[in-house]
């Protein structure tokens, strides 16, 4: 009698085989295979397809082990090596699945994404589909829940999302030539967009290759979508405090693991966002979609009050939005009439903006590099202390290298200063009110026990621009001899100029006030403070300062102004520091870590990445430890988020700092994983 059909108590048969259960998701069918532990994964899939006997392309399918939350992608590995036994339940499922992506402009698109790829690779493929360069700056985020609202039914959530759905077909990752452009920079790249209005220079079929997107409206991703109704804005989640902002950052996906491993389901809605606030090589010729989506992310951050700005700044941002909305409507009609001469003029005008936004260096010839410029002027200085009513005191201040020396008078400047401030590593915050002629600079200077707070008050815009630019450079360890100093001064002056009120508002024609919708241009805080007519008048006054800008220039100016805000580029996390008893905030920016007061957001202490020796994570107790020069050691536990997210932010910024324009190769994925994945 044959023994091969006799089943033993352990589930194995007498001949050494055992039954493996596989669920085929496409057919919703369970299949049982007789296998041994020596059968490799590829052999299991072959047996499965033969047994199914269904004529179908199975090439995209792979085995997924639900219990272990892992893909079995190494087809040469045996079942024994994978640790699979008779009790394992496997799924045979497509690797590419549908995902609903909310873009930075808040619109949804349906995309097919590889659920078995690491998220970093999946985002790179998504960005190729959308023709967005530098995908390393973006990532995927789970949708934050509004804690102030009761749990809603899924149907209610879906109906809200449908109002923001982009029309058009399913977007598939394509293989057209447009996607083969290098991830970093290439001197041989052909301009893809008109630098004047951001529309494609080539026909859409060539622009998007064979992608399904070419069947719809590819230009939609490069065109700003105005907020259509105040009701949509009112329904959206607005963080009420810094702690709410910090909780939003719980949702960042792990870039080193796949979507399936992180429990992302097919057709789930995820947010595609610029994660790292370090934008490299922004170029209007190639980056119309990238610039527009960056502008949209900045716009929504202001409207939803995710970032603070002054009243004058909000009116300036509203005026730029109004201008961009008007020009976006005109773009499709006027694009064919643009001459090459116009594009050349805009190229020249935008060159400074490109340099500023990418953080690069100018090509201007330096002057005498042996002499470092200095500033010397009367400045009012204030050192706030508890239980004191003393105000600003005027000093003769000289700014040399990265230090400010304060003297009681100009005549005493050859002697010993009354105060000396070393600004290397300090926090620099503007406090400006144009109409009130207030031009203050707040400095938080690192000392052994924390931060010393110093305020500088300037007399006028010109003085403020020079001293503010010098302070910003000094905080990074740079002097006024740096080639970016003059450009920084000009950018500050231009930022202030855009906030000026027009002296003669009667010049605004009555007929154009009707197309301004202030409820969709300013944040709710200012809507509550003023009547709609008052806001409209102020927006139109501010619009006269930007009315001559081209579409792309206006978007670039908006991004640049966003970057100038004190809170820009800081990602917050709730943390408990070693030795501390209460919860505080840790802020991560492109160049530093900031310990912050959870209620006020004030910086308690700052540490620069340039002084960092190493950082590591104790995965058992979830503690992040960062070591700096001078034996400084920082340890904290993240209370509301996996410490892996914080670890990835630090490593991600270190990775981005290694980028250079002379690199022609594609992204070094392995280097990114080494810096961010950790020992999980």
Curated annotation (Swiss-Prot):
Keyword Cell membrane among record annotations: yes
InterPro entries xref list: Band_41_domain, FERM_2, FERM_central, Kindlin/fermitin, Kindlin_2_N, PH-like_dom_sf, PH_domain, PH_Kindlin/fermitin
Positions of transmembrane segments: none
Cellular compartments annotated: Cytoplasm; Cytoplasm, Cell cortex; Cytoplasm, Cytoskeleton; Cytoplasm, Cytoskeleton, Stress fiber
Positions contributing to a 1,2-diacyl-sn-glycero-3-phospho-(1D-myo-inositol-3,4,5-trisphosphate) binding: 383
A GO cellular component entry from the record: nucleoplasm
Subunit and interaction comment: Interacts with ITGB1; the interaction is inhibited in presence of ITGB1BP1. Interacts with FBLIM1. Interacts with active, unphosphorylated CTNNB1. Identified in a complex with CTNNB1 and TCF7L2/TCF4. Interacts with ILK, ITGB1 and ITGB3.
General function of this protein: Scaffolding protein that enhances integrin activation mediated by TLN1 and/or TLN2, but activates integrins only weakly by itself. Binds to membranes enriched in phosphoinositides. Enhances integrin-mediated cell adhesion onto the extracellular matrix and cell spreading; this requires both its ability to interact with integrins and with phospholipid membranes. Required for the assembly of focal adhesions. Participates in the connection between extracellular matrix adhesion sites and the actin cytoskeleton and also in the orchestration of actin assembly and cell shape modulation.
Protein name: Fermitin family homolog 2
């Amino acid at each position: 009698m044959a023994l091969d059909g006799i089943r033993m108590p352990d589930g194995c048969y007498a001949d050494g085989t055992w039954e493996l259960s596989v669920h085929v998701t496409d057919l919703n069918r369970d299949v049982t295979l007789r296998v041994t532990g020596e059968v490799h994964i590829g052999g299991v899939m072959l047996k499965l397809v033969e047994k199914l006997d269904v004529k179908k392309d199975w090439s995209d399918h792979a085995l997924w082990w639900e219990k272990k939350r892992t893909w079995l992608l190494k087809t040469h590995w045996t079942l024994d090596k994978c640790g699979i036994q008779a009790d394992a339940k496997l799924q045979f499922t497509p690797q590419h699945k549908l995902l609903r992506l909310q873009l930075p402009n808040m619109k949804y698109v349906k995309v097919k994404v590889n659920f078995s790829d690491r998220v970093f690779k999946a985002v790179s493929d998504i960005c190729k589909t959308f023709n967005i360069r530098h995908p390393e700056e973006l990532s995927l985020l789970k949708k934050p829940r509004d804690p102030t609202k009761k749990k809603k039914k899924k149907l209610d959530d879906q109906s809200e999302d449908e109002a923001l759905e982009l029309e058009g077909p399913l977007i598939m990752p394509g293989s057209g030539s447009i996607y083969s452009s290098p991830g970093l920079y290439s001197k041989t790249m052909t301009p893809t967009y008109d630098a004047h209005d951001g529309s494609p220079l080539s026909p859409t079929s060539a622009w998007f290759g064979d992608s399904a997107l070419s069947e719809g409206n590819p230009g939609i991703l490069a065109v700003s979508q105005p907020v259509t109704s105040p009701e949509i804005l009112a329904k959206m989640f607005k963080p009420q405090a810094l702690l709410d902002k910090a909780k939003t950052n719980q949702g960042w996906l792990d870039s080193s693991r796949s979507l399936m491993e992180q429990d992302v389901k097919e057709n789930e809605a995820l947010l595609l966002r610029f994660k790292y606030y370090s934008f490299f090589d922004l170029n209007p010729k190639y980056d119309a979609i990238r610039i527009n989506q960056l502008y949209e992310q900045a716009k929504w951050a202001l409207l939803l009050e995710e970032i603070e700005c002054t009243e004058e700044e909000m009116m300036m941002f509203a005026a730029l939005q109004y201008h961009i909305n008007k020009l976006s409507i005109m773009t499709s009609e006027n694009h064919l009439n643009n001459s090459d001469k116009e594009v050349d003029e805009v190229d020249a005008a935008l060159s400074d903006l490109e340099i500023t936004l990418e953080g690069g260096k100018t090509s201007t010839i330096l002057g005498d590099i042996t002499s470092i410029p200095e500033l010397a002027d009367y400045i009012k200085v204030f050192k706030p202390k508890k239980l004191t009513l003393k105000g600003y005191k005027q000093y003769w201040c000289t700014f040399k290298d990265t230090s400010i020396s304060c003297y009681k008078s100009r005549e005493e400047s050859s002697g010993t200063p009354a105060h000396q401030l070393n600004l290397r590593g300090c926090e620099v915050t503007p406090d400006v009110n144009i109409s009130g002629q207030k031009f203050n600079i707040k400095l938080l200077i690192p000392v052994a026990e924390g931060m010393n707070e110093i305020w500088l008050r300037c007399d006028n815009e010109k003085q403020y621009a020079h001293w503010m630019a010098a302070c910003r450079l000094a905080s990074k360890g740079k002097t006024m001899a740096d080639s970016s100093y003059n450009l920084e001064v000009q950018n500050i002056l231009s930022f202030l100029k855009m906030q000026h009120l027009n002296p003669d508002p009667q010049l605004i024609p009555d007929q154009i006030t009707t197309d301004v919708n202030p409820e969709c241009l300013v944040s709710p805080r200012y809507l509550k403070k003023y009547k709609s007519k008052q806001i409209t008048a102020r927006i139109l006054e501010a619009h006269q300062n930007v009315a001559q800008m081209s579409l792309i220039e206006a978007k670039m100016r908006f991004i640049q102004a966003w970057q100038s805000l004190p809170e820009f580029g800081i990602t917050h996390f709730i943390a408990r520091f070693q030795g501390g008893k209460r919860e505080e905030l840790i802020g991560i920016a492109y160049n530093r870590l900031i310990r912050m007061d959870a209620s006020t957001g004030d910086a308690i202490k700052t540490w620069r990445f340039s002084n960092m020796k190493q950082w590591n994570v104790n995965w058992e107790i979830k503690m992040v430890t960062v070591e700096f020069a001078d034996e400084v050691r920082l340890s904290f536990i993240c209370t509301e988020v996996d410490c892996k997210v914080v670890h990835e932010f630090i490593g991600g910024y270190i990775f981005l700092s290694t980028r250079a324009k002379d690199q022609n190769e594609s992204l070094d994925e392995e280097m990114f994983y080494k810096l961010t994945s950790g020992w999980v």
